[in-house]
Amino acid sequence: MAIASTLASTQNPFLCLRQPPSPGNRSVVFRRCQDPCGRRWISRSIRACQPSDKVSGQFPFDFMYSSMLIPSSCGEWNRIHLGGDGGISASAQRLYFGKELLSFASDNFLPLALVSGVGLGFANPTLGCLADKYSFTKISTCGIFIISGLTLRTEAIGAAVKGWPLGLFGLISILLLTPSFSRLIMLVQLQPRELVTGLGIFCCMPTTLSSGVALTHLAGGNAALALAVTVASNLLGILTIPFWVSRYIAGGVGVSFPTDQLFRSLIVTLLIPLIIGKVIRESFKGFANFVDNNRKLFSKINAICLSLVPWIQVSRSRSLLLSVQPKVFLAAVGIGILLHLSLLAFNAVSIRILSGLTGGSKSSKENSTAVLLVSSQKTLPVMVAVVEQLGGAFGETGLLVLPCVAAHLNQIMIDSVLVNLWLRRGKDTSTKVKTA
């Protein structure tokens, strides 16, 4: 009867209203539907909501405690229940928890992507081996540096030049200081011996080709400085790797290294993609604006490209990993974690001292973040290339690489957690400033 009387109204046609079960300050929804052309329904809603602090439950938004009739295109009426009797509808609960889940995934996208890559490599190594066959690792590395070129602002290059003292320290730390940690690693007695030898070689490597830059970008550090240190250390590292491996790993015995091949590979996978990305940015200003307005999207694409590396490496090493005793492998993993934490502590203290001498401005903080991340990581692809070219001079190639795969994954995960902590601390600080 109520609906019929409402439909009969000439002043307010198709006004559908159901009051809450009991009087009070509840949400009321008015929906007016007009049919000016006889074919298409046009709806307008007017909503009066109860204050959120009076709604039972812990949901930070208001709910409708009424239902409404909505006409369909075929002339039928559909009733939608939006809650009632002061309760919260199941759809609203699902919406809230869905938003919370999406927010968590967005805030922790990189570690989730890395864990997913490792899990996929263990669950189905066939896909990872197929991706390795078609050089997806090189493709993902090229993709990361193309994105780095796309997001590289010209003014950031000037900031990188201004941060040359920290950048120079980063190069010295990567190429001259941190390789000496391999001497301590070689003192560890662990069988098979290749596990320790592999970590020693890993310690002599330059910084990661992609993850340091990607993490610097996520942390809001000086990505241009991170790029400069990454490219320079990997190109110069071709000259320093033979010396350190011969001195600390081979006991002074000379070993042959594929210097020319490594140099060409790094030029193709690092420098050329970076230049291509920068040229595209400078050539198409509209696309540059699109990149600047969607930096979070490109950061997620960076994270996906980065997760391909552990996925492929775990897929390749799965059978070998299962053949090693868990106790021995966990010990090697622990050594890798301890190595990365030691590098972080050493570089953090050194950077703090150097930053105190050069000044503690905001730009100095961004430079410190970049140098700390890139100077504390070691690259896996270059290590794999070096070991493969040595032809088994230090033992089984798979066993040499296996602990380094774990160390590579652990350093990325540790640093991604560290970056997330920095981001949350920055959000809390900005919130307190706004509140004050």
Swiss-Prot record:
The chain crosses the membrane at residues 109-129, 131-151, 157-177, 195-215, 225-245, 257-277, 297-314, 328-348, 403-423. The keyword Iron does not apply. InterPro entries: Na+/solute_symporter_sf (IPR038770), Put_Na-Bile_cotransptr (IPR016833). Residues 1-47 form a transit peptide. It comes from the Eukaryota. It is found in: Membrane; Plastid, Chloroplast envelope. It is a multi-pass membrane protein. Gene3D superfamilies: 1.20.1530.20. GO terms for cellular component: chloroplast; chloroplast envelope; membrane. Keywords: Chloroplast, Membrane, Plastid, Transit peptide, Transmembrane, Transmembrane helix, Transport. The keyword Transmembrane applies. PANTHER family: SODIUM_METABOLITE COTRANSPORTER BASS4, CHLOROPLASTIC-RELATED, SOLUTE CARRIER FAMILY 10 MEMBER 7. Belongs to the bile acid:sodium symporter (BASS) (TC 2.A.28) family. May function as sodium-coupled metabolite transporter across the chloroplast envelope. This is Probable sodium/metabolite cotransporter BASS4, chloroplastic. It comes from Arabidopsis thaliana.
